[in-house]
Amino acid sequence: MSDKIRTLQGRVTSNKMDKTITVAIERQVKHPIYGKYIKRTTKIHAHDEANQCNEGDVVAIRECRPLSKTKSWTLVEVVSKA
C-alpha cells in the first residue's frame, strides 16, 4: 500500500444524510475513437462530522478506512461556499 493519501476535489450534490455528504467529482476522458474529450462524473459518499457542508459547496476530501458499506472518504476542508 502506498504512503500517499488520495485527495480529491468535487462539488457537494446532497447533504440530506446525517454526517454524510455526496460529492460529485468531474473528470475529462478522451473518447477512444473520436478523440473528443467527454465529461464523466463519479459520485462518492464522504463523512462530514460537523454537518457543515451545503449543496453546491466545493470541498476537498481524502480517502480513509471504511466507515460504512459505501463510505470510505472524509471531508478535509470546504474550499468555497455555494
UniProtKB/Swiss-Prot annotation:
Keyword Ribonucleoprotein: yes
Pfam families: Ribosomal_S17 (PF00366)
Disulfide bonds: none
Keywords, sorted A to Z: Ribonucleoprotein, Ribosomal protein, RNA-binding, rRNA-binding
An annotated Gene Ontology molecular function: rRNA binding
Gene Ontology BP terms: translation
Top-rank lineage group of the source organism: Bacteria
GO cellular component: a single term: cytosolic small ribosomal subunit
Purpose: One of the primary rRNA binding proteins, it binds specifically to the 5'-end of 16S ribosomal RNA.
Similarity remark: Belongs to the universal ribosomal protein uS17 family.
HAMAP family: Ribosomal_uS17_B
Subunit field text: Part of the 30S ribosomal subunit.
Name assigned to this protein: Small ribosomal subunit protein uS17
Species of the source: Shewanella oneidensis (strain ATCC 700550 / JCM 31522 / CIP 106686 / LMG 19005 / NCIMB 14063 / MR-1)
This protein's encoding gene: rpsQ
